[in-house]
Amino acid sequence: MDKNNMNETLNVLETRRSVRGFDPERMPSDELIKEVVRAGEYAPTGRGMQSPRMVVVTNKAVRDKLSQLNAKVLGVESDPFYGAPVIILVLADRSRPTYIYDGTLVMGNLMNAAHAVGLGSCWIHRAHEIFDSVEGKLLLASWGIEGDYEGIGHVALGYALKEPAEAKPRKDDYTIWIK
């Protein structure tokens, strides 16, 4: 990797912020979504076992159903996905000892890639609770997903309504060096 590409990668990592307000009318193109998903597919996984699975939801009815289920777990009536038109659900195979870490790395890659291609994203929790429920398991089965998968998280994806706030300064004791 040349120095310019490395600097751009580091810039993406330092400037990505969670977006909590999306334009629900502005759907990213399939091409942009595929670029983001490809980054998720190349996330590191324990022993290269690729335990995660991703479900890309652009269907509004399914997206709204996921929002409703998430809001129910959270105990609110508002949209936990902040109006994002695309939801990427990350699941991971519980039979792999590193499944939670694998799924978490996929989530990180998805959010960083979204920023790199000009999209906003936000990690939305409660996938575990949703997809451990009877209704969640029925959804997985209807999508052809068999096995013992745990919901790791949802990535809310789309165009931000406004620029996210600047990053807070990093805490002084974030890193300890032992030389």
PLM-predicted stretches and their roles:
Residues 1-179:
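Acidic, surface-exposed loops and disordered segments
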